[in-house]
């Protein structure tokens, strides 16, 4: 009878069940939405389809490695290493809550290809930057994507923070964007002044998305913010390769040109 009970507990505590618990816990603790989105994407798309239904206490190093190798086979070495870290977080949470004996991801040290660190591609020539800004003005995709592209080089904030901008965070009177402390993992809200151009773009967006939570909502996923891929695809559509410019690179552009 005790053996049957233990077996039932194992079945109920699969990797995906424990993973969902951990995501909910992180959300309660105030983890940044962009961090939760990345974690959930890795779990839902890269890990749970292969090890999700296995009792968390029975996940073996080999099973986890096979799931990670699938990611590597697509050339996504950085994603594979990130997925290993996420799996480790789930397994350590399982250990801490008495549902597993150890974190088997530790056994995979050195098993994955180490992703080569690359700097975000950025335009640092003023004339080339001007050409990019003109190209953005001529973008004829969805208004949400175009507006996000327009404000990114003007705000000097991380793309994830911009995509998760909420109407409740915009102070029209003081002309600023107040990012809550929990989003930034800081003790105080992060204040971003809004220049005239940004305010005009936000005014245009207000008539389109004011009824929702996000300033730049996804057209496909109701109630969700614009995806990172949406902005990336827009830059590719404008004729800029990943080696020329990325949405993350705008901060490097700002640092370089302001220093000069």
Task: Specify the residue positions occupied by each region the protein language model found.
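Basic, Lys/Arg- and aromatic-enriched nucleic-acid-binding interface segment
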Residues: 29, 71-88, 96-165, 173, ...
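Short, surface-exposed polybasic/aromatic micro-patch for ligand or macromolecular engagement
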Residues: 1
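Conserved hydrophobic/aromatic pocket- or pore-lining residues that grip, position, or stack substrates
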Residues: 36, 47, 64, 87-90, ...
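Short, basic (Lys/Arg/His-rich) helix/loop patches that form interaction surfaces
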Residues: 134-146, 155, 192, 206-220, ...
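Basic/aromatic-enriched alpha-helical hairpins
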Residues: 5-74, 90-93
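Hydrophobic (often cysteine-bearing) scaffold residues that line and stabilize catalytic clefts
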Residues: 11, 15, 19, 32-35, ...
């Amino acid at each position: 009878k005790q053996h049957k009970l233990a077996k039932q507990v194992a079945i109920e505590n699969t990797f995906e069940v424990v993973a969902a618990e951990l995501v909910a816990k992180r959300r309660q603790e105030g983890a940044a939405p962009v961090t939760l989105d990345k974690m959930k994407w890795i779990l839902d798309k890269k890990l749970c389809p292969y090890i999700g239904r296995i009792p968390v206490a029975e996940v073996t190093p080999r099973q986890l490695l096979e799931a990670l190798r699938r990611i590597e086979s697509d050339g996504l070495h950085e994603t594979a290493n990130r997925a290993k870290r996420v799996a480790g977080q789930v397994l350590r949470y399982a250990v801490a809550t008495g549902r597993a004996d150890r974190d088997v991801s530790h056994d995979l040290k050195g098993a994955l290809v180490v992703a080569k660190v690359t700097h975000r591609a950025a335009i640092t020539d003023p004339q080339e930057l001007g050409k990019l800004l003109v190209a953005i003005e001529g973008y004829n995709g969805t208004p949400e994507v175009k507006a996000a592209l327009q404000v990114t080089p003007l705000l000097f904030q991380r793309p994830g923070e911009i995509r998760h901008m909420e109407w409740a965070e915009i102070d029209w009177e003081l002309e600023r964007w107040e990012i809550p402390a929990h989003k930034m993992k800081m003790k105080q809200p992060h204040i971003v002044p809004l220049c005239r151009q940004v305010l005009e773009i936000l005014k245009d967006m207000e008539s389109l998305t004011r009824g929702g939570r996000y300033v730049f909502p996804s057209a496909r996923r109701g109630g969700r913010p614009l995806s990172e891929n949406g902005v990336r695809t827009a830059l590719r559509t404008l004729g800029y390769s990943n080696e020329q410019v990325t949405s993350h690179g705008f901060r490097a552009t700002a640092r370089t040109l302001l220093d000069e």
